[in-house]
């Protein structure tokens, strides 16, 4: 069905030509819209400081939700923060690297910059590529992403293709490896000429099960003298909404996989470099190249993923797959209180109170803003159920979500004495002011989707009276802000529990509290009704 498709635009290097971009997008939107979003690959800002400043300050408005990558030239790095940010209501900087799960169901991977060893925001290296792949290694049955956005081209992209680019383009070997693992259905890149490669296969004919094909589209820069194409429109049906037969249908002009020879050569060289002095491979090593990567979603034991780009020294990244995916074999399932169709409730590690729960998505989704409507609806059902449970105990429910330096949707739900409710709003706003940012009160008819774009960090708290406090000013945002406010003297008076690591319980105690939570929640547990249907 057409409604299952996302209608998107993608453009090449803008290079500061904002007026021309907006004019073209406005015309295209009127003639062929509405479009869900515009993605810009390549260099976005230009040399006109005045225009750049107007865009950053929101004085130049974009007609549809627009998402941009980071710099590919170090001269523009100063214009970008370290984390993703919403420059204006319709302009979002995605960050250096990450995954964007859209409300329409698309999974979009992105990596900014050029391959290099510099630590500047304009460069990426092997560690960046590995970190981007980490959350995908935990997805059971992972078969690919819908879209991959990169600033530059992958190396050897034109190999085995009948049509060739008008000019040879330098490519990144690391991006070739990334594309081989991600298997995107569409791969858009900038910093080059216009080139729509014939689709390539992601499997070996007769040797491997059929997989979907990949379409690589290189886009030229706005205002290029050759007047090459710099804007591309397409309808993309999310992979997760497609039957296997539809997904793996092979176009008649599909070519062989372009990166095989390159990656086999690299793998062979890496194996040789690991050999010891007598020409033998080190014990336990094995030479193997798999085009598909971890098809069954086995964990790879690498560092945890962070969507926001640089986040301090890399050796400080937590190790392992996503802690909150139920499909993760290492998930602490003894903490689970109830499991719905799209979400589940669990007691967090180091709870603030004995009835502190969090509601998380069953699938790997980053935030409420990027969640499909059925996930958001089930979060509300859990919220209503835990509110009833709190009322029965003479308590009130406070909820908050921090979509900042997190990789999995989690809404914290904490019960407090009703007598403490009056101090909540002032406690939140005072703590925010002390931390250097402002919490705004959302209007009664405003939703999170009205306040922030997908992929942008934010914090939101909902008070027992239904009012919501919100910020997207995340510079210097305290990671324990929500817990800090609730643990303060006027509310729960347990300031020793601000950091969850300082109050982790023994497993036996966790099991005891979870069993009590299940018992208390049972009269309000709508998931039990779902199971009986």
Swiss-Prot record:
Residue ranges, annotated region (Disordered): 290-314
SUPFAM superfamilies documented for this protein: HIT-like (SSF54197)
Pfam families: CwfJ_C_1, CwfJ_C_2
InterPro entries to which the protein is assigned, alphabetical: Cwf19-like, Cwf19-like_C_dom-1, Cwf19-like_C_dom-2, HIT-like_sf
Gene Ontology biological process: mRNA splicing, via spliceosome
One annotated GO molecular function: RNA lariat debranching enzyme activator activity
GO cellular component terms, semicolon-separated: post-mRNA release spliceosomal complex
Assigned protein family: Belongs to the CWF19 family.
Protein name: CWF19-like protein 1 homolog
Protein species of origin: Caenorhabditis elegans
Lineage of origin: Eukaryota, Metazoa, Ecdysozoa, Nematoda, Chromadorea
Gene that this sequence comes from: cwf-19L1
